[in-house]
Amino acid sequence: MDYNLYDFLPLYHPVQTPAFDRDVNSLSEFTQYELPREEEFPQNPGDLMLHQKLISNFINPHTLYDGVLLVHEMGTGKTCTSVAVAEEFIKNNYSSGETYPYTMVKKIIVLTKGKGLQNNFVNEIANVCTWGQYLEGLDRYIRNRDKKIKKNVKVHYTFDTFEIFAKNLAKMSTNEKRMTYENSLFIVDEAHNLRLHSDPEEGNIYSEIYDLFHLLKSRKILLLTGTPMKDRPEEIIDLFNLILRTPLSVEDLDQPEQFKRKINGHVSYLRAMISDVDRREMGKKLGSLNHFRVQPVVMGDFQSQIYQLAKAKDDEEKSIFNNSRQSSAMVFPDGTYGKQGFEANILPTTSGHKLKPEIRDELRLNLRKYSAKYADLIDRLKVDYTEGRLSFVFSEFVKGSGLVALGLLLELNGYVKATPSSNFAKPQKRYAIFTNETSTDAQTKQLISAFNNPKNLKGEYISTILGSRVIMEGFSFKNIQSEYILSPHWNYSETSQIIARGLRLGSHNDLKKNNIKFEVRIYHYVSLANKNYPAESIDLHMYEIAEEKDLEIQKILRYIKEAAFDCRLNQQRNTITNRKFDGTRNCEYSSCSYECSNQVDIGHDNRNYRLLYFQSADQYEKLKATIIETASRQPFTIEQIVAETKHSEFEVMTVIESLLNYRKVLFTRPEGYYYLSNIKNLFFASNVVFDRDKHYDSNDPTLLNYYTKYTTVYMGKSIGQLIQENQQKYMVFLVKKIFKSKNLVELQKYMVQLPIYLQEKLLSYSISVRHQDIKNNFVRDMVLNNFKLYYKIQDPQAFIWLNPENFLCTANYRDPDQWKPCTPSQQRDIEYMKRDRANIKVSNNSYGFIGLLNRKTNDFCLKKLQGPTLSDEPTDKRKRNVGKRCQNWKKVDLVDLVANKLKVVPDEDFDFTAEDANTVKNNPKFKKLVTPEMDQNDLKRLAFWNAQDVNHLCRTTLTQFTAQKLVVDDPNCGTANKIR
């Protein structure tokens, strides 16, 4: 095994160098995460996707890369990507075995636009992006859970809004900033909101944060965004300049190659996994549009006149065209529109809204007069329903002339509004509406679940979805075949996000499985005041401006995609293979195929991976398992493992050295623990600790034959002697642990591992010194408490029946040397004692249960007592109630026992208000447990114990029953040997 010094030194090259390009496309810690075209989403909390692992290896304690802009589309898991990076630093800060150079961060600071986003971020950290470490200890609480989670998360993460963070920075001196924020990791969520602004206050926020990032010499920065530019290409300059040590200028945008060189190593680009189903933009190109297709509808004279007045009002008020936009959607028969029209023509009801009766028939019969857009839409929705196509309609307007009014128009045309209580077993023409004002999150999720159900393929449950901006994040629709965009936006990025709700990866799998041929048709509605003057349209005007902006933005986005450090690694995922999209927005208005700036071929260089990452990789654990399994069977050499596993010699030695140096237990057998040992290049399992520095004559053929033949090496002693010696060593170890126990649970953990004769020894000595003031009286009392079911003292006599095959008795329990096997008559007396004790437990028991404990298995059972006061005697006398494991009882019975009968007090920090008490009273699941005479304390107990898991309820019951001497010995508890 010949190694050079550089084999043990990790190496990363600086960005913007040819060596960096080689590193990114060849180092195994990066290239092993090359993305396939499709990838399954994680099923368990803390599981990461490939691109998330890649970024966490790029911005990492061991790398010198200090700032990356993540241009990752919506749905790629940007939050979890940043958390994966942060958790690597947290893990490294607490690692005691780190041997290579690394960056330790003092703080992890998450910056968001508003406080609401912070709550989402905390929730993602605790429940989605990590394996549960921030939820530990919370399973027993139902109140203040979010507050407790946030407290746990804030141990490692600090949260601030852009505004508050900038204001605090403005109050700090330069030295204070350095002292506070040097060696910090900054995560900036929705970073496109942080930019130079015409508003002085917004501009100051950007400047303060920019100055801090450039003041710090050692910092790591992650900027998260799915839309780095919304209105102008120049917005990207502000973003990159937050992380670049050498700033960009606007002129760089006109020099693509120079721009790409300057951002090299500082940007990652990733498309979402989107559906590759056929989609068709309906309509035609109008006005100055060269790429966007729109679906034009011409207003009738009445609507057109009102629209012209609304437009003039907007021009006069120099407003944001709200009047024009509302009136182009719909005007009411009285000539009103928007907020005024809504209040004058739509009435509130207990379940929502309704149209005034006097306008219902007019709108049903002459809708095109008042809304060309809605009349055309409803005609198309009727065809969709008839032909079994699911449809999705979007408008950013809810009230006014928006979605609520549209829903009422649908009802005039035979639709029924779907609610969570709808009878979906009966097919019906239904629509569902999702807005902040018409449905809660829970209701929205229920209805989307019904809509996405494979049984709703042709609209049997719900045929049409009406959605506002509330559905932009977190919701996806399946099997949509028609999408209708009723209101445009000044930039197209938001419109594209809306369309993507119905075009996700796998969103149309149910249609494919049923061999239904389909395409997704997309309609961008524009209302024209007059077909001869298409420019007279606020809708068309907005699309023209959006396209003009989008052409420039997408050109810069193509540069970013080509310059991304992970361009080659993500190319399969990012490339759209359907040639029909060439020249469209989907491919940045260019060819869908593209070349990366970094042209280095993908390779696999393990120089850093084996040093920094191998020990935390799945391959390491698999190799370790193989080595342990081999050692359990026979001795082995390194060469044998290399040949068998195809791992490198370095990797095999890494595992072996870890097992040797840290004396890790390979496996346990009755004679003790086994460790890995070696003599030169021969490795074997042994429960004898070998001194690695001691010389052994490994050339002795007899010794070598012995090593090869036997897994474990012993010298000069019989197997029986060695087993006895090792058992003695282990027993000493257990007894030491018992005498260091801090509580009864800890003592029981080690006590059950002792042979029964040693348990008897400890119990008999504890009985003999029960009245003495000894050093370990705390342990003595725990031993007596642990075995209280298995002894009785009748001063001066005492009896122990811990071992069912050998009872112990003494005529003078104060003398520890007088314990002897019981005589037959004493054994009979003990059986009477046990029976009498059980009878007392039944007769004095007001709880309806008795506890059974199996000492051999530590199983705890509950037996329901029978009798006239507790339950009727069974008519079939052959059936006997023998009890069952506590965990097998219904939770409601255990809650009733602990809360209502034992009346165990809840934890001190369990908050409970009068409002909570009313909730408990009215909750159907507490119906059998709540009685009229219960006060707030009773209800608090009930709520608390209902929030606990069954294991905790059983532990509490055992503790309470043991304290009240309501537990009896039963060797059949928890076994299949019950007498029935």
From Swiss-Prot:
Location of the Helicase C-terminal domain: 389-546
Top EC class for this record: hydrolase
Motif (DEAH box): 189-192
Keyword vocabulary terms for this entry: ATP-binding, Helicase, Hydrolase, Nucleotide-binding, Repeat
SUPFAM superfamilies named in the record: P-loop containing nucleoside triphosphate hydrolases
Gene3D superfamilies: P-loop containing nucleotide triphosphate hydrolases (3.40.50.300)
Positions annotated to bind ATP: 72-79
Keyword Ligase tagged: no
Annotated Helicase ATP-binding domain residues: 59-246
EC numbers: 3.6.4.-
A UniProt-annotated Pfam family: SNF2-rel_dom
GO molecular-function term, one example from the UniProt record: helicase activity
Entries under InterPro entries matching the protein: DNA/RNA_helicase_DEAH_CS, Helicase_ATP-bd, P-loop_NTPase, SNF2_N, SNF2_RAD54_helicase_repair
PANTHER family recorded: DNA EXCISION REPAIR PROTEIN ERCC-6-RELATED, SNF2/RAD54 FAMILY MEMBER
Family the entry assigns: Belongs to the IIV-6 022L family. SNF2/RAD54 helicase subfamily.
Record protein name field: Putative helicase 087L
Species, as recorded: Invertebrate iridescent virus 3 (IIV-3)
